[in-house]
């Protein structure tokens, strides 16, 4: 649904802000943490995934991974900061206004409607404006309650 897509965007953007503060600025553990979320509409409307990745010193990997999981759990327990929600709303509404001038945006809207009968535009502004920290909290909680987490670490050999 449009609301779930918007909630995923709010969650990923809130995590981006939190990880910038905790992992990069406070711990100096990485230049940046990338967060990507996606909802699947095929074959079901009820599948989602959240991908979080970062580079770090191998000696800091465990600590940084723990910080990343703790921050995600904190949002699922307490919700994101109201400031993050407000900044995300402002950003999303501004970006939407800009995207509405682009053919690619409308092609995607038509594609979503054709394949999934999903109207991803008509109520966009109202949905974005209606999102609360509690909504994002419940969304994050539902993701974590799936208890379906995979951790992958890649360590490169130096020759």
How should these model regions be labeled?
Residues 21:
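Carboxylate-rich, divalent-cation-coordinating active-site regions
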Residues 143-146:
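Extracellular/periplasmic catalytic domains that process cell-envelope and extracellular macromolecules
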Residues 129, 133-141:
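Mature hydrolase/peptidase catalytic cores and their serpin-fold inhibitory cores, especially
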Residues 1-5, 9, 24-130, 148-156:
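M16 family metallopeptidases and their MPP-like homologs
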Residues 15-16:
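Short Ser/Thr-interspersed hydrophobic loop/turn segments at strand-loop and sheet-helix junctions
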């Amino acid at each position: 649904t449009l609301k779930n897509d918007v909630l995923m965007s709010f969650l990923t953007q809130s995590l981006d802000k939190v990880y910038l503060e905790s992992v990069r600025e406070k711990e100096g553990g990485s230049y940046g943490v990338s967060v990507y979320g996606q909802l699947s509409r095929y074959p079901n409307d009820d599948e989602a995934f959240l991908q979080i990745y970062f580079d770090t010193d191998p000696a800091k990997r465990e600590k940084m991974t723990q910080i990343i999981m703790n921050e995600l759990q904190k949002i699922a327990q307490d919700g994101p900061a109201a400031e993050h929600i407000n900044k995300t709303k402002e950003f999303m509404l501004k970006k939407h206004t800009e995207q509405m001038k682009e053919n690619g945006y409308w092609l995607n809207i038509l594609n979503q409607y054709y394949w999934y009968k999903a109207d991803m535009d008509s109520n966009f502004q109202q949905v974005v404006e209606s999102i609360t920290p509690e909504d994002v909290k419940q969304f994050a909680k539902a993701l974590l309650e799936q208890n379906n987490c995979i951790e992958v670490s890649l360590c490169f050999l130096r020759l």
